[in-house]
From Swiss-Prot:
Subunit relationships: Part of the 50S ribosomal subunit. Homodimer, it forms part of the ribosomal stalk which helps the ribosome interact with GTP-bound translation factors. Forms both a pentameric L10(L12)2(L12)2 and heptameric L10(L12)2(L12)2(L12)2 complex, where L10 forms an elongated spine to which the L12 dimers bind in a sequential fashion. The proportion of heptameric complexes increases during cell growth.
Basic and acidic residues biased stretches: 314-325
Xref: PANTHER family: 60S ACIDIC RIBOSOMAL PROTEIN P0 (PTHR45699), LARGE RIBOSOMAL SUBUNIT PROTEIN UL10 (PTHR45699:SF3)
Domain of life: Archaea
Protein name in the entry: Large ribosomal subunit protein uL10
Example of a GO cellular component annotation carried by this entry: cytosolic large ribosomal subunit
Keywords: Ribonucleoprotein, Ribosomal protein, RNA-binding, rRNA-binding
GO terms of biological process kind: cytoplasmic translation; ribosomal large subunit assembly
Matches recorded under HAMAP family: Ribosomal_uL10_arch
Reported function: Forms part of the ribosomal stalk, playing a central role in the interaction of the ribosome with GTP-bound translation factors.
Family, per entry: Belongs to the universal ribosomal protein uL10 family.
GO molecular function: large ribosomal subunit rRNA binding; structural constituent of ribosome
InterPro entries reported in the protein's UniProt record: Ribosomal_protein_uL10 (IPR050323), Ribosomal_uL10 (IPR001790), Ribosomal_uL10-like_insert (IPR040637), Ribosomal_uL10-like_insert_sf (IPR043164), Ribosomal_uL10-like_sf (IPR043141), Ribosomal_uL10_arc (IPR022909)
Organism: Methanococcus maripaludis (strain DSM 14266 / JCM 13030 / NBRC 101832 / S2 / LL)
Amino acid sequence: MIEAKSEHKIAPWKIEEVNALKELLKSSNIIALIDMMEVPAVQLQEIRDKIRDQMTLKMSRNTLMKRAIEEVAEETGNPEFAKLVDYMDKGAAIIATEMNPFKLYKTLDESKSPAPVKGGAIAPCDIEVKAGSTGMPPGPFLSELKAVGIPAAIDKGKIGIKEDKIVVKEGEVVSQKLAVVLSALDIKPVTVGLNVLGVYEDGVIYTESDLKIDEEEFVGKIQKAYTSAFNLSVNAVIPTSATVETIVQKAFNDAKAVSVESAFVTDKTADAILGKAYAQMIAVAGLAGDDALDEDLKGKISSGAAAPVEEAPVEEKKEEKKEEAAAPAGLGMLF
């Protein structure tokens, strides 16, 4: 708390203000410094209304905010918090919230609104006046338009702009006369709002450049990373809750392919092995001359008949089981 010293008496309202700021700084886990220097009063009130339920915004003198931040850092034993003052700029204000820094930045960015450009300001982009009626009756405004280089004339009883015209290019200074004309035409080339200077969370201070991300690009990178990690897990056979089913299915398919290729018969591969053998038989028969084939084979070759799937006689099953038992058990256990 600020203590009044004999040689320099501090105004009571300043002490109260610093204490109120300290209370605000201690009330939330996320503290942000924002720049509101160029925000007109009307837009500022609109922004306040938009964010009122999500965060607390408090304006004060920079010297008092600096004092409050430093005292809170000292009282809480948190020197990292004191570094927030390094991001303070003209027209700064404090925001206290529980919203994470990225969501806070997005919310503030979305709360920005278009505004008229001021005379003497630097054009943020090429400012163009479109052709068409201004809706204004003949009068002095016609001369004002022409004075700033906008081709205008009376059209159907109203002042109209003859053609599209770029009146100032990006980076150029907007004259006072042009600013008045653009405002009268309701052209708002400037976006105003609360700009993030620094956001403190758990010992880390984020700047606007840290928080300004392309969401589509960011999500795309996460999806790509997930796909790469998923494929690595499957191919390296490192089971996780997300990949175990795919790994088991891949192992099953690989084992089944080996079984079919090596003609190792199981209840899961018998049909595929028979189908393959049948197809090979038809292919070989097709290479033989007609004299070597009976009528049945000739008919099957000409019709491209599919391999028949026949049920084995009951009495043959016992013998098949004996043959399977004599085969290597390892492969059969996979099915």
